[in-house]
A protein has these predicted regions:
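Conserved small-domain helix->loop->beta segment predominantly found in fold-type I
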Residues: 410, 414-417, 842, 849, ...
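Conserved PLP-enzyme active-site core in the AAT-like
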Residues: 529-534, 608-611, 615-873, 932
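Glycine-rich, acidic
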Residues: 120-126, 143, 247, 251-418
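Glycine-rich, small/acidic residue-mixed loop/short-helix segments
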Residues: 370-526
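Acidic, proline/glycine-enriched N-terminal capping motif
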Residues: 101, 116-207, 212, 343
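N-terminal glycine-rich, Lys/His-bearing helix-loop that initiates the first secondary-structure elements
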Residues: 110-147, 525-615, 978-997
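PLP-dependent enzyme catalytic core of the Aspartate aminotransferase-like
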Residues: 1, 527-531, 618, 922-997
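N-terminal amphipathic/hydrophobic targeting modules at extreme N-termini
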Residues: 2-6, 37, 41, 67, ...
Length: 997
């Protein structure tokens, strides 16, 4: 079994996997697509006159079941002799696992075929393919490998589980240069070229005036002074004619550099590790899709793009000088990659529902032209930005989009503008689909299969992050189709397979890339968990609930070492007060001008909570060192939303009659670099951030990080971005935080450059560290501070907002807006019980802050040093003992984080698995994020963290069961510190506890 988060790290496992794939390939030979390109002649194999069957001979049956065997040419001294042997034996030649062929019957035809094949173009890697035993075919005028000896099934599965190499050097590589290169590309491509910056790529389509596709392509910006446009191999000459015809009037040039540069697609979960092994372990690109990088691979220059045609969440396309192509290919094979041919490339892209020109673009099975908006990727590849002007096909595409929008609302009254769409299709009945087969709904012809075959997949067991990828594989009949636009996801249809109607369905997709590093097959018909409805006597359930609650409380509070940095345990006093009356009461209030801005409450019985809230504001002003505090928000996320809403309202204060303008550019920490989710366009910022009309993306720019320390901001690079974008709002703060934020330096710079902005610090994780041992944000120049009150701070789970505006400041009006956007804008009942508990937490924090904060910082540094000494890979700068906060980060290997975190939990050590700045997502997490604040409060000191570090090293590195020792260690630290132990307070708390029972 292979756990979902694991890579294959040793040669023995490679050998096992390889043997499994070979066995699967032998068992699952199948027939696939009969035609690759309707505008070209039938594809032909290099051996004899065998050719891909346009009649789909043997369609739907496995070759062994059809009584056929793969031709054997052992002992042949030449290629011609091998073909002759096959012919003399009377075998019908069958391409293993892909398409059936008929053997040549006449020697003259063999000679003619060999002469024709010798006239085909060859890539820089042709000799490498032949030496590896590849079966070569005519593909769009190129002699290309269709498969290698292991077969297409093996190649497909190896790509999905390890790493495969694809020769994509046959594709056209066009260099666009000159002063008007961007304007030209804006005119001939559907995408918004202005959205590209150096280091980025984009998918695009070359459109004709009718809104059909001349070709689809990828545009790369490796350098500031040129673009690289990569087009389909079979269309290169046609594309060049089209593009050069449109070049008139533009001061730029098009140069075909296909011969000078080779291209290799390196695809699969292990590809990043293999390529980084050639790059000295350095980052290839940013971990986002379409990111680019120029790197040195063992001294050879390479241009690396995080792109690909397999659907893999981890995949790169590498461009190298032609002279370096064979070296790179062979070097990657040495490291464990396997070569793969066009056959596997087709099954992989089909599983990913990626279009192939001449199948899902170009001419439809009925001879009509497929509109661009019939292809789902048009949503990303077509722009109507004003930046583009009147580009080729714009008018037709705008019409198509109008129909597309109607269909999204399920308005199919008029389908004339976009009658059909490309969609995935899956057979329910046993059989195999082929391109061109008709699709029916009842007696009505509703479309055609455009691509179809039998595709392998790995079976799994378990669910969620516990899903395990098994060695066993299965197969499923899937494909793509061109179908009536009013056919919806999950609709049932029938496919006419050689006169027999087979049941099929239109799924949403065939696979998902949302849980890297693996692409996950989505099998149609897998039952979702049933939605149960409670019934019967609830008394036993209530008893079970309280028993489990008691068990969980004892486990977390008495037996576990809790290291999740976003958590803390409130004191007994805070917990008791939070559960007391006025919990579940209401105390809505606001300032009323008619009463000289006095607070007016909407409910009676609120005098006590009124006093509590006023006292809490006073305590938090003292803690922050600021002028105003809002305590009614219920979380850090709500605090941020209230601030963003207020900033947007403040921006529009002069015009209440027009549509409100959203916030312009915001500068923040990217979520992959540790930024808060609540400060991202996908989070609390979502409804308040403008779309940049140039990039057509949210107007957000991210703080750059140091090349040698991705956890620390590169201040000088940040200053350049500040000067370029001049953001309206700057948001400091991270959830993966090892360093102080450079608030003072940025404040000084924006003031000097006269950048009118608002500086906000989201201190959710470090709110309890504000002070001389960490940072004083307002003293350093922050205007706004938001945060959560339950991480390093001592409070229950709430939010808070502080500002440093005075009544005569212009932005004091912003403060008043923040108040109104809190109530009634964000919250009605502001949870009075936890607000009461929060006042006690504020008393505790102000009383013990100095000793607590010093202990937290010292413990974090000591813990980091101990973890390192015990052999673990601690992230951060060793010059500062790896951290300046409560957090410590340990790298455990790409994709290993979830499993290691689960293993530690089984041993009563609760941590947070974390994706590092170089990783693609939480399922690919290769680190553990830990915080020392909670255990510091329970009395852990340097010696205790050192002992804990040793236990963790034993568990992580050696797989030792340390549960009993962890329980013993925790059992020695059950008394909370940094809280009041006054006898009178304890007596009253006992009385309160008795009343709460």
């Amino acid at each position: 079994m292979f756990p979902s988060g694991k890579m294959f790290l040793d040669k023995r496992r490679f050998a096992v996997i390889h043997s499994v794939y070979k066995a699967d390939s032998a068992a699952y030979k199948y027939i696939s697509i009969g035609r690759w390109d309707r505008e070209r002649s039938q594809l032909r194999r290099r051996r004899g006159t065998q050719k891909l069957s346009g009649k789909r001979t043997g369609s739907g049956r496995y070759s062994e079941k059809a009584g056929r065997q793969r031709p054997t040419t052992e002992g042949a001294t030449s290629h011609r002799e091998g073909i002759s042997q096959v012919t003399q034996r009377g075998h019908k030649a069958v391409m293993s696992g892909f398409v059936s062929f008929f053997a040549a019957q006449k020697r003259s035809m063999i000679l003619k075929e060999e002469k024709r094949m010798s006239e085909l173009k060859r890539t820089q890697l042709y000799d490498v393919h032949v030496a590896a035993g590849a079966e070569m075919v005519d593909f769009g005028g190129w002699e290309m490998p269709i498969q290698y000896p292991d077969g297409i099934i093996a190649e497909h599965l190896y790509t999905r589980q390890v790493c495969s190499l694809f020769d994509v050097s046959h594709m056209g590589r066009l260099l666009i240069e000159g002063p008007e290169r961007q304007a030209f590309l804006q005119h001939v491509l559907t995408s918004n070229v202005a959205a590209l910056d150096v280091g980025l790529a984009q998918y695009c389509i070359i459109a004709n005036e009718n809104g059909g596709a001349v070709d689809d392509a990828y545009l790369y910006m490796f350098e500031a002074d040129n673009y690289l446009l990569v087009v389909n191999a079979a269309n290169t000459e046609k594309d060049l004619v089209h593009l050069r015809a449109a070049l008139t009037g533009f001061d730029c040039t098009i140069t075909d550099i296909s011969k000078e540069w080779a291209a290799i697609a390196v695809q699969g979960p292990k590809c990043k590790e293999l390529l980084m092994g050639l790059n000295g372990g350095k980052q290839l690109t940013e971990p986002m899709k379409n990111a680019l990088g120029i790197v040195s691979l063992e001294g050879h220059e390479a241009r690396v793009a995080k792109t690909g045609y397999t659907g893999e969440p981890l995949g790169y396309e590498v461009y190298v000088r032609s002279a370096d192509a064979a070296w790179l290919w062979n070097r990657l094979v040495e490291l464990g990659a396997h070569p793969a041919g066009l056959g596997a490339r087709d099954t992989l892209r089909m599983e990913a529902s990626l279009p192939l020109y001449s199948h899902e673009m170009g001419t439809a099975p009925d001879g009509s032209e497929i509109p661009i908006f019939a292809v789902p990727l048009a949503k990303f590849a077509v722009s109507f930005s004003a930046q583009k002007g009147d580009y080729i096909g714009r008018a037709a595409l705008e019409k198509q989009q109008r129909y597309f929008k109607r269909y999204m609302d399920r308005d199919f009254a008029d389908m004339s503008g976009l009658p059909r769409k490309i969609a995935p299709i899956a057979l329910v009945d046993r059989g195999v689909m082929r391109a061109g087969m008709e699709i029916y709904q009842g007696d009505k012809l509703v479309g055609w299969v455009t691509s179809g075959t039998m595709v392998p997949y790995f079976k799994t067991e378990g669910e969620g992050l516990s899903t395990v990828i098994l060695e066993a594989s299965g197969k499923r009949a899937i494909g793509l189709c061109y179908i009536d636009s009013n056919i919806l996801t999950d609709d049932s249809v029938e496919v006419d397979v050689r006169g027999k109607r087979l049941k099929a369905v239109i799924p949403a997709r065939h696979m998902s890339v949302g849980a890297p590093p693996f692409a996950r097959p989505l099998l149609y018909g897998v039952e979702e968990e049933a939605h149960n409805v409670g019934s019967g006597d609830r008394t036993p359930k209530a008893l079970e609930l309280v028993k489990k609650a008691l068990e969980n409380h004892q486990w977390r509070q008495e037996q576990c070492v809790n290291l999740i940095p976003s958590e803390n345990t409130p004191s007994r006093a805070v917990r008791l007060l939070s559960g007391s009356d006025p919990a579940c009461r209401y105390a809505e209030h606001k300032r009323v001008l008619a009463f000289y801005e006095r607070e007016v409450f909407y409910y009676q019985g609120t005098k006590f909570i009124d006093e509590v809230e006023r006292l809490l504001v006073e305590e938090m002003r003292a803690y922050f060192g600021c002028t105003e505090v809002e305590t009614r928000t219920l979380s850090g996320q709500m605090s941020n939303m209230a601030v963003f809403s207020a900033l947007m309202d403040w921006k529009n204060r002069f015009d209440r009659k027009s549509e409100a303008k959203r916030l312009g550019y915001v500068m923040n920490n990217h979520i992959i670099k540790g930024g808060h989710l609540s400060a991202q366009p996908m989070g609390a910022l979502h409804d308040y951030i403008a779309i940049d009309p140039v990039t057509e993306k949210p107007a957000v720019v991210n703080f750059p990080v140091c090349a040698d320390n991705p956890y620390k901001m590169d201040v000088e690079a940040a200053k350049k971005l500040l000067d370029r974008y001049r953001p309206e709002l700057i948001v400091f703060g991270k959830s993966m935080v090892l360093h102080k934020e450079p608030v003072a330096e940025i404040r000084k710079f924006v003031d000097e450059q006269n950048i009118h902005t608002t500086i906000m610090y989201d201190m959710a994780h470090v709110l309890g560290l504000i002070g001389d041992h960490f940072q004083n944000p307002f003293a350093e120049g922050a205007e706004l501070v938001t945060g959560s009150t339950h991480k390093t701070f001592f409070g229950p789970q709430r939010g808070i907002i502080g500002v440093n505006y005075k009544e005569d400041d212009l932005k004091y009006g912003l403060w008043k807006t923040i108040q109104s956007r809190t109530f009634p804008g964000s919250v009605s009942n502001h949870h009075l019980g936890t607000q009461l508990g929060m006042l006690m937490a504020a008393y505790e924090m102000n009383q013990f802050r100095d000793t607590y904060q010093k202990a937290v910082i010292d413990n974090a540094k000591s813990f980091a040093r101990s973890l390192k000494a015990h052999g673990l890979d601690v992230a951060g700068d060793p010059a500062i003992d790896y951290t300046e906060t409560h957090q410590v980060i340990v790298s455990v290997g790409y994709g290993e984080g979830p499993e290691i975190a689960e293993r530690l939990e089984r041993n009563n050590i609760v941590v947070n698995y974390q994706a590092t700045p170089d990783e693609e997502g939480f399922t690919a997490s290769g680190a553990l994020r830990m915080g020392v604040s909670e255990m510091t409060r329970f009395g852990f000191e340097a010696k205790d963290f050192d002992k804990l570090a040793g236990l963790m090293a034993d568990c992580i590195l050696r797989g030792t069961d340390v549960k009993e020792e962890v329980q013993k260690l925790r059992g020695e630290h059950l008394e909370m510190r940094y809280c009041f132990d006054d006898a009178e307070i304890d007596q009253v708390l006992e009385e309160l506890a008795a009343k709460l029972v």
